[in-house]
């Protein structure tokens, strides 16, 4: 019976992707699909794209593919083009080659596996790659989301949290994240779907099981520094590096925190945010800090 591996939210994390590629090879799967967000939130997007293209794995387009393509095409507010808060996004967009961008731009929003005609794979929901399904999604919300679905099995991603949920006669699976898990487990995460040989006519014939793969996070720390991404992206790159350490969402909580304070993102808020969020010691242990040349909390490079 067929085995289908689905991975997503790689987010330019090559060491995590390489560990998952090796694990998939050991699982004897028959088909592999990438459910979006190959790039963004990390420094090696071009390398990830080349890896996936060389393997010939089918992909769908995630919201971060859209974000970086929009930056490259100038489809973003004028203020973002010089705003230090968006320096990391500009860096990531420029890191992609023309061939990378063309590949990402051609990706579909939905994919049906060759060996799973009753499965639909999307990045977020059938309606949008910027919406997500997570443990917090209510039955009423899920019912609304599934009205757009024309198959009994939905595989999605986007929230960076693995999920397996039966809803009536349907199965909803969130892959979790390869490169930036937000469930407190720093291992790279993906899912394998196995077809059940004895499923009845009205039964869901797929069984889902997540895989959790350890990888060398020290290598990721070195890549952040050696590529120049940590310096170029300012506080946003530092917050993304902290997400690698904590396996929790850090950037979005920071932006919400800043908005509530009526401030703007910048190094002057770094220490206060980390202290209030309880991540100061984690950041210190990982060597993630404001530029030492900045005496007043304002970034100086």
What function would you assign to each model-found segment?
Residues 79-83, 115, 119-149:
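Active-site-proximal segments of metal-dependent phosphoesterases and phosphodiesterases across multiple
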Residues 109-117, 165-167:
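Short acidic-hydrophobic surface loop/beta-edge motif
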Residues 166-175, 179-301:
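Acidic, His/Gly-rich catalytic cores of divalent-metal-dependent hydrolytic chemistry
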